[in-house]
Amino acid sequence: LSVVALDARKAGIVDQEVDVFTVKALFSTLTNVDFDPARFVDLIGRCAVLRDALKNRAKKAGAIINEKPAVVTFQPETTVTGLVGQAKVASLKADTQANADIQSLQHILLFGIKGVAAYADHAQILGQEDDKVYAFVQEALAAISRENLDLNGWVGLVLKCGEINLRTMELLDAGNTTAFGHPVPTKVPLGAKKGKAILISGHDLKDLAQLLKQTQGKGINIYTHGEMLPAHGYPELKKYPHFCGHYGTAWQNQAREFAEFPGAILMTTNCIQKPRDAYKDNIFTCGLVGWPGVTHIADHDFAPVIKKALELPGFAEDREGKSVMVGFARNAVLGVADKVIEAVKGKAIRHFFLVAGCDGAKPGRNYYTEFVEKAPKDTIVLTLACGKFRFFDQDLGDIGGIPRLLDVGQCNDAYSAVQIAVALSQAFNCSVNDLPLSMILSWYEQKAVAILLTMLYLGIKDIRLGPSLPAFITPNVLNVLVENFAIKPITTPDEDLKTILG
């Protein structure tokens, strides 16, 4: 579809339906989004229908469609078994004679544009689009399908992916802040209130807004889970009195946490895991998320979720708990930039750490908890994405009224972190690389790859990456990253802090 769309674009034909479908279909293939085979059979079949319709339309308009690439005439099977058989041929790994370094860069590009697609879909839902985002996603997919580029050509596309992802995160930032206001520092309870309850997980703030609106006056309290935590900082969401707190931690702990939750559960976007029998009847999906046998809400009418919440017992009594602060996105942080600059100049703040990225179950992720705990008291820790759940409830104190732990937001709020870094570099009249700022990133899935590519596009160096380096990066490609960007694997918190701070 992207090969045809790219050829059609050369003749001035741009199809909005194709563009939106492309990012939604790509987003569906992200880790922990859609596990429903029937939906993928439909998606793949629809993709072929859209491709053939666009091909015919483009030809009639005088476009030259290159039909040599097999993907332009490929007809998918209509069953799961048939498609699995075809997948062995379609896979990037199918060509065993291919250059391993080029295959590595193709994988990086593919994972990167999947991350871009996720953010583009969220932005589009909130009314924010840029045609160059769709055009690049199609350019990248077409290149993977048919281009015979050299190593430098693929490196160029990978860095362009970082550029496009920056623009996409900017669109999503505009969508979120236009619809819900700029986040403000907000205290979020981690306990629970007596009463009926719904837990909402994932990333989609529009779904949350709809749920809050539909549950007004029904005696149901709404709790966030996972990356929904930063939603409490948005003025147009926090205004609802029944939006009462946060429950649980990161995505990989959901089986235990969901089983103990006494209400209904709504999964938006990723990150769903196989539901346990204990709560399978209480969990719902919406948007692009899917699991076979789980009720899917396709139209933002959350009546079934509300009905289930009213049937379930809810919390029998109030539960005391800690509280955490959220809402330190670019607007809030830059609003106190003068205090931050003064504290740096007065040596009250020695260094900033951006400790961010995905969480996961793999051993070694306790590095991030230990790193934050051991960071000296004259340092500030900015965090975003679900990696924060390794330490989000730590009380690190403050420096002159500035909290030492600043939650910038969801993974896409890397845009906010970049804007904060750029503003500080301008204030100190230096490059971002010359700031007293170190980036300690954890990676797990495709959005983290897209964010890393954005950092590389911006020329940011000395990024520490863990808990291990991605398996799809070959030694030669890693060498390019090390030589050009000084990327390095994490070691131990003590060793890395010593190297950074001296």
Which stretches of residues belong to each language-model region?
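Anaerobic metallocofactor- and corrinoid-dependent redox/one-carbon enzyme cores
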Residues: 1-24, 28-38, 45, 49-52, ...
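N-terminal alpha-helical interaction blocks
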Residues: 133-147, 157, 161
